[in-house]
Amino acid sequence: MSIFENLSESMLASFDSKDRAREEALRLSREVIRLCSSSIRSMHRGDLEAAERLMKEAALGLEKIRVVLKDHQDVRYAGFVDGAEQEYAEARNVYSITTRHEVLTPEDTGVELVNYLAGLGDTSGELRRHILDLIRSGRPLEGEYFLGVIEEIYCLLMLFDYPDALTRGLRRKSDLARSMLERTRGDLTNALALAKVEASLLRFSDTANAKKS
């Protein structure tokens, strides 16, 4: 057997191993993203038990990815794992912010810093949805806290003005957070103003009825 035959066998074996790891990690990443999306939908429906269960399953999926790619770090940074980590960080923060008014740290979520920040940017969109749900249910005042969180998220993301090669598209997340902030501030301001008008009309009606009686 020539040296080239030996080389080809060993290199092909290496690439076969890497390809199998990539396929498994890709499958797991898609599953993590699906679980996180389902978890967030459960939160908006008020099914917190299901949301927690789905997040735990997603966490297990991320751990499996780390094991599968332990010896293939080049595949780890191909991009698809980042998407899974971002979705997980988003789901964890949406749950924590809406149920406990607590923003989790990167260490709490266990994902890489840049993926944590990207997930936080996406969190602003889910917080906008939560605020709109509060407005529809006649509780606009509760939305002020969450609007403040969106603003803090935007201010945080604006600090990371680094090349895209380092932040992996974080600028787009900053733009998203700014859009969510501006639109939601307008919606909430209108809802609060309407609530004040309705309260004034109710007081006027009560006063008028009291005078009649």
Task: Please report, for each region that a protein language model flagged, where it lies by residue.
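Extended alpha-helical coiled-coil scaffold domains characteristic of the BAR superfamily
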Residues: 29, 81-95, 99, 117-121, ...
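Long, charge-patterned amphipathic alpha-helical coiled-coil/hairpin "stalk" segments used as oligomerization
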Residues: 92-148, 152-154
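Non-transmembrane, amphipathic alpha-helical segments
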Residues: 17-28, 40-43, 47-50, 73-83, ...
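Amphipathic, well-ordered alpha-helical segments in soluble domains
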Residues: 3, 7, 28-31, 35, ...
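Long amphipathic all-alpha helical oligomerization modules
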Residues: 143-213
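A structural signal for long alpha-helical coiled-coils and helix-turn connectors
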Residues: 40, 132-135, 158, 185
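Long, charged all-alpha helical bundle/coiled-coil segments in cytosolic proteins
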Residues: 52-111
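Leu/Val/Ala/Ile-rich N-terminal alpha-helices, chiefly Sec-type signal peptides and the beginnings
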Residues: 1-69
